[in-house]
């Protein structure tokens, strides 16, 4: 299950998110690996990227399940975005638990011809009960690709557009593509589970 939403986030909130994520005060962390630290296949390709854990992560790992939650000073961006989603769509989030929210910035890849990251799901257990929201914070290229369960057949390519977001089931394999025409691709990734 996936659904793409356009024109549901007000210009005011979309501009606020973009401006904040691209502000010099918003600190990014270097990410050498897209998904996992160990690379099971030497042919596997990880996009070098920058990220900022907004809630629920420590050292790149979710800590919500440990009974602890960390929130960055930028958690208000998640609250603003979710408020807009609740107000302007029929998406029901009240019975969901927020597991993780992070922002990611990708740059053009000059190292390899490969433009897609590792195909992955965001968490390893109970995927069918989880949902993901991927919000595009700026105008750019660098599609998100959703795959069928065989992890070979493309289900949908989603092009970034400022203010667009895609809601999809946690069991859908997916990957990001680095931009080739734009200087940066900025997203917020929000993961929910059942309460």
Name each region found by the language model.
Residues 1-94:
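Non-heme Fe(II)/2-oxoglutarate
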Residues 64-195:
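Catalytic core of non-heme Fe(II) oxygenases with the double-stranded beta-helix
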């Amino acid at each position: 299950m996936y659904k793409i939403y356009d024109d549901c986030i007000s210009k005011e909130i979309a501009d606020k998110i973009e401006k904040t994520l691209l502000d010099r005060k918003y600190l990014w962390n270097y990410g050498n690996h897209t998904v996992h630290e160990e690379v099971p296949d030497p042919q596997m390709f990880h996009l070098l990227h920058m990220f900022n854990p907004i809630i629920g992560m420590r050292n790149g790992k979710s800590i919500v399940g440990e009974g602890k939650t960390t929130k960055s000073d930028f958690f208000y961006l998640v609250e603003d975005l979710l408020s807009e989603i609740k107000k302007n769509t029929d998406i029901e989030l009240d019975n969901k638990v927020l597991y993780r929210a992070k922002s990611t910035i990708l740059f053009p890849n000059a190292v390899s011809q490969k433009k897609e990251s590792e195909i992955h799901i965001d968490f390893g257990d109970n995927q069918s009960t989880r949902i993901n929201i991927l919000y595009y914070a700026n105008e750019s290229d660098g599609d998100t690709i959703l795959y069928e369960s065989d992890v070979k057949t493309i289900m949908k390519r989603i092009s970034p557009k400022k203010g667009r977001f895609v809601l999809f089931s946690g069991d859908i394999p997916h990957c990001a593509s680095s931009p080739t025409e734009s200087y940066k691709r900025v997203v917020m990734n929000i993961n929910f589970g059942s309460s």
